[in-house]
């Protein structure tokens, strides 16, 4: 008798376990039903897209239903729309055309948009995967001065980056040209300069150089050689430092380090920074206008005007 109860208990536990699995499998199928069903694109009349939610997908990866991909107001995260609705406006003979609307702060508006849907079997399939459409949009300022300011800031940042890279590259090139050049030429130039110095150093009376060449050379070598601590050893070919010494008379690699070149580059860099900052402040601090509310654009940073307005933009359909 006890054995029969034990068998019944095992059957009951197994039934509960299997029923739980069936319920989970049914719920899983329902959750992915949108990814398995197809619909004719031209029959879709309205798309309601929400921020932070993902699309369904069958062949590719899901995408965000709404994604900002640029525009002059792309940094204004708090002004992003929460919902966008797109309405089927008919076909242009190639694909469905959409009008997308969103409720936004009056300081921004929708720019260029792109409605993207997943083709059911292939990208250009007339049928799409249900709930697979998303919208990529740009967010623009409605105020012309702020729009120009954002464009100028972006352009200035790129110019500064390019200038800094070029400036650093020029410095590195000059350093490698200075320190990495072979020292054989410098040594030969130094030897020639030493010979000229020994022959022409004022050690006697004018007119006696031809007759007393040997005496002058011996005298110069004895009196101005490396043994005299007050005068550098011109015949020493081993430089104290790791870089080749500058050749003031030969016009060699040392020309890179002439003060005029680096002073000019530094001055140009500082002038460019000052000029760009001045333009930046000029754009972001426009003179007050009595034709618009003071609360809309009182400063360069934007927290929005607090006034909502409807914004719309038009798009075709891209496939993935």
Curated annotation (Swiss-Prot):
<feature type="compositionally biased region" description="Low complexity">
    <location>
        <begin position="307"/>
        <end position="320"/>
    </location>
</feature>
<feature type="region of interest" description="Disordered">
    <location>
        <begin position="186"/>
        <end position="231"/>
    </location>
</feature>
<comment type="similarity">
    <text>Belongs to the SARAF family.</text>
</comment>
<dbReference type="GO" id="GO:0006816">
    <property type="term" value="P:calcium ion transport"/>
</dbReference>
<feature type="compositionally biased region" description="Low complexity">
    <location>
        <begin position="285"/>
        <end position="300"/>
    </location>
</feature>
<feature type="topological domain" description="Lumenal">
    <location>
        <begin position="26"/>
        <end position="157"/>
    </location>
</feature>
<feature type="topological domain" description="Cytoplasmic">
    <location>
        <begin position="179"/>
        <end position="320"/>
    </location>
</feature>
<dbReference type="Pfam" id="PF06682">
    <property type="entry name" value="SARAF"/>
</dbReference>
<keyword id="KW-0106">Calcium</keyword>
<keyword id="KW-0812">Transmembrane</keyword>
<feature type="signal peptide">
    <location>
        <begin position="1"/>
        <end position="25"/>
    </location>
</feature>
<feature type="compositionally biased region" description="Low complexity">
    <location>
        <begin position="189"/>
        <end position="231"/>
    </location>
</feature>
<keyword id="KW-0813">Transport</keyword>
<dbReference type="GO" id="GO:2001256">
    <property type="term" value="P:regulation of store-operated calcium entry"/>
</dbReference>
<dbReference type="GO" id="GO:0005789">
    <property type="term" value="C:endoplasmic reticulum membrane"/>
</dbReference>
<protein>
    <recommendedName>
        <fullName>Store-operated calcium entry-associated regulatory factor</fullName>
    </recommendedName>
</protein>
<feature type="transmembrane region" description="Helical">
    <location>
        <begin position="158"/>
        <end position="178"/>
    </location>
</feature>
<keyword id="KW-0472">Membrane</keyword>
<keyword id="KW-1133">Transmembrane helix</keyword>
<keyword id="KW-0732">Signal</keyword>
<keyword id="KW-0109">Calcium transport</keyword>
<comment type="function">
    <text>Negative regulator of store-operated Ca(2+) entry (SOCE) involved in protecting cells from Ca(2+) overfilling.</text>
</comment>
<dbReference type="InterPro" id="IPR009567">
    <property type="entry name" value="SARAF"/>
</dbReference>
<keyword id="KW-0406">Ion transport</keyword>
<feature type="region of interest" description="Disordered">
    <location>
        <begin position="285"/>
        <end position="320"/>
    </location>
</feature>
<keyword id="KW-0256">Endoplasmic reticulum</keyword>
């Amino acid at each position: 008798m006890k054995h029969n109860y034990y068998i019944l208990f095992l059957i009951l536990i197994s039934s509960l376990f299997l029923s739980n699995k069936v319920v989970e499998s049914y719920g899983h199928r329902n959750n992915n039903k949108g990814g398995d069903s197809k619909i004719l694109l031209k029959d879709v009349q309205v798309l309601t897209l929400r921020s932070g939610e993902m699309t369904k997908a069958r062949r590719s990866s899901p995408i965000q239903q709404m994604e900002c991909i640029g525009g002059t107001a792309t940094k204004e995260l708090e002004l992003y729309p929460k919902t966008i609705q797109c309405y089927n406006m008919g076909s242009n003979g190639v694909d469905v055309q959409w009008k997308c609307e969103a409720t936004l702060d009056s300081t921004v508006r929708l720019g260029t948009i792109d409605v993207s849907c997943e083709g059911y079997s292939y990208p250009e399939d007339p049928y799409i995967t249900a709930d697979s459409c998303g919208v990529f949009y740009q967010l623009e300022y409605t105020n012309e001065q702020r729009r120009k300011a954002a464009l100028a800031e972006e352009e200035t940042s790129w110019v500064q980056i390019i200038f800094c890279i070029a400036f650093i590259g020029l410095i590195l090139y000059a350093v490698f040209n200075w320190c990495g050049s072979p020292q054989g030429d410098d040594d030969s130039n130094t030897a020639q300069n030493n010979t000229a110095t020994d022959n022409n150093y004022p050690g006697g009376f004018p007119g006696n150089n031809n007759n007393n060449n040997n005496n002058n050379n011996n005298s110069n070598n004895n009196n101005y050689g490396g043994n005299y601590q007050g005068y550098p050893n011109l015949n020493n070919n081993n430089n104290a430092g790791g870089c080749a010494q500058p050749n003031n008379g030969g016009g060699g690699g040392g020309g890179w380090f002439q003060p005029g070149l680096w002073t000019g580059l530094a001055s140009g860099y500082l002038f460019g920074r000052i000029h760009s900052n001045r333009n930046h402040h000029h754009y972001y601090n426009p003179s007050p206008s009595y034709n618009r509310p003071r609360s809309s654009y009182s400063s360069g940073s934007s927290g929005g005007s607090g006034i909502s307005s409807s914004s719309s933009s038009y798009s075709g359909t891209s496939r993935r």
